[in-house]
């Protein structure tokens, strides 16, 4: 299935919405970053309407950091579209024929987009830091007090012995800079229910990224032996993280505004169990139990009102096509086959023809 570019999605979105909003910074996703580096300081944000003075200042003072922030935003939108490609809402930012967008509605879809965008920015900045691409940051912090120490004699050590070393992804920097930039508008309107929702979901995205970090290790020794093992912390691939966040989307909690405080309502969430709903009933959205849960204020729009004609629906046609039926086509495609490893270091493949079936909504 062809995936539309996230840049195009963002452009379409901002043709629909007034940029004077919490979403104005998304306009950066269509900004040309090719000349942004530590040696030159083009004002990447000068033509982006709706940014706060603080965002404009950060953009002017940190062009190289903003370049990777933009890259993270683009990655988030692209990954969102890929994750939802087989669902009724495929992460499109406009609803043809409806005259609105999911992001104008404080829905579970909006909750996911905010969370994935905040995490995408942090992911991109954290990885750029660990690669030495940003002068203002370096490797992430090394965990302390692990109690696992490598020993000199391989025969007397267990496979779990290691020392923290190497270069961890700097998620702390990514989250800190991302929060200061992305959350700027909503922090200034923190008494408004929609801004409270946005800030909560941004925090969830960043917190889940930290929680998803894994230990990666490398052995050191003669002839492949593991006399010493060093380990560091790395983030998961972003598409893997997006899949985990999708589970949170399915279990997102409906909240209501109660005297400028968001409270979880006892309304069923997609894929949730009655037990989990009873547990969350009448719970403050800022409570400890809700720290890792997405929240939303409004029901989702009717995605069956969208013109889905000719949309590829895969194995989920009854849901995506909304009962309008679908057609199946058979196509011959080229794909690599009979691949062989050629020393050193190349993989050579032949090209084979394959008959595939594709389903499209009527």
Curated annotation (Swiss-Prot):
The keyword DNA-binding does not apply. Its main location: secreted. Glycans are attached at residue 90. GO terms for molecular function: cytokine activity; frizzled binding; receptor tyrosine kinase binding. Disulfide bonds join 80-91, 129-137, 139-167, 217-231, 219-226, 304-322, 313-317, 321-361, 337-352, 339-349, 344-345. Expressed by anchor cell and vulva precursor cell descendants P5.ppa, P5.ppp, P7.paa and P7.pap. Expressed in the tail and weakly expressed in the vulva and body wall muscles. Residues 265-274 have a biased composition (Low complexity). A lipid is attached at residue 223 (O-palmitoleoyl serine). Disruption phenotype: Embryonic lethal with severely defective embryonic morphogenesis with the formation of unspecified differentiated tissues, no endoderm and excess mesoderm. In addition, embryos have defective mitotic spindle orientation in the 8-cell stage ABar blastomere. Residues 263-282 are annotated as: Disordered. One of its GO terms (biological process) is establishment of mitotic spindle orientation. Palmitoleoylation is required for efficient binding to frizzled receptors. Depalmitoleoylation leads to Wnt signaling pathway inhibition. Pfam families: wnt. Keywords: Developmental protein, Disulfide bond, Extracellular matrix, Glycoprotein, Lipoprotein, Secreted, Signal, Wnt signaling pathway. It comes from the Eukaryota. PROSITE patterns: WNT1. Residues 1-24 form the signal peptide. It is found in: Secreted, Extracellular space, Extracellular matrix. GO terms for cellular component: extracellular region; extracellular space. Belongs to the Wnt family. Ligand for members of the frizzled family of seven transmembrane receptors. Required in embryonic development for endoderm specification and the correct positioning and orientation of the mitotic spindles and division planes in blastomere cells. Involved in cleavage axis determination. Binds to receptor tyrosine kinase cam-1. Together with wnt ligand lin-44, plays a role in controlling vulva precursor cell P7.p lineage orientation during vulva development, probably by acting as a ligand for tyrosine kinase receptor lin-18. This is Protein mom-2. It comes from Caenorhabditis elegans. The gene is mom-2.
């Amino acid at each position: 299935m062809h995936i539309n570019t996230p840049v195009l999605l963002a452009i379409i979105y901002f043709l629909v919405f007034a940029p004077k909003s919490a979403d104005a910074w998304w306009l950066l996703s269509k900004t040309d970053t090719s000349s942004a580096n530590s040696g030159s300081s083009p004002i990447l944000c000068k033509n982006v309407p709706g940014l706060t003075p603080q965002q404009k200042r950060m953009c002017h003072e940190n062009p190289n950091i903003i370049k990777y922030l933009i890259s993270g935003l683009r990655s988030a939108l692209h990954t969102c579209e890929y994750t939802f490609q087989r669902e009724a809402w495929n992460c499109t930012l406009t609803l043809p024929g409806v005259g609105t967008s999911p992001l104008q509605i404080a829905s579970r879809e909006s909750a996911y987009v905010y969370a994935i965008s905040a995490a995408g920015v942090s992911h991109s900045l954290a990885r750029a830091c660990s690669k030495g691409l940003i002068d203002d940051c370096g490797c992430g912090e090394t965990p302390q007090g692990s109690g696992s120490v490598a020993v000199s004699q391989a025969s007397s050590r267990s496979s779990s012995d290691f020392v923290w070393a190497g270069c961890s992804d700097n998620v702390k920097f990514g989250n800190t800079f991302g929060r200061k930039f992305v959350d700027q508008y909503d922090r200034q309107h923190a008494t408004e229910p929609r801004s409270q929702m946005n800030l909560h979901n941004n925090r969830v995205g960043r917190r889940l990224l930290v929680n998803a970090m894994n230990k990666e290790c490398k052995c050191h020794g003669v002839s492949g032996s593991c006399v010493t093992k060093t380990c560091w912390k790395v983030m998961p691939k972003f598409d893997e993280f997006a899949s985990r966040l999708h589970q949170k989307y399915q279990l997102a909690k409906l909240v209501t505004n109660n005297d400028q405080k968001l409270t979880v309502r006892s309304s069923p969430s997609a894929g949730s169990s009655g037990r989990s709903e009873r547990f969350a009933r009448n719970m403050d959205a800022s409570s400890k139990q809700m720290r890792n849960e997405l929240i939303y204020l409004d029901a989702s729009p009717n995605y069956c009102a969208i013109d889905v004609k000719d949309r590829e629906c895969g194995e989920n046609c009854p849901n995506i096509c909304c009962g309008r039926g679908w057609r199946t086509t058979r196509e011959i495609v080229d794909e690599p086959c009979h691949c062989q490893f050629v020393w050193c270091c190349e993989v050579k493949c032949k090209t084979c023809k394959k008959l595939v079936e594709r389903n499209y909504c009527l």
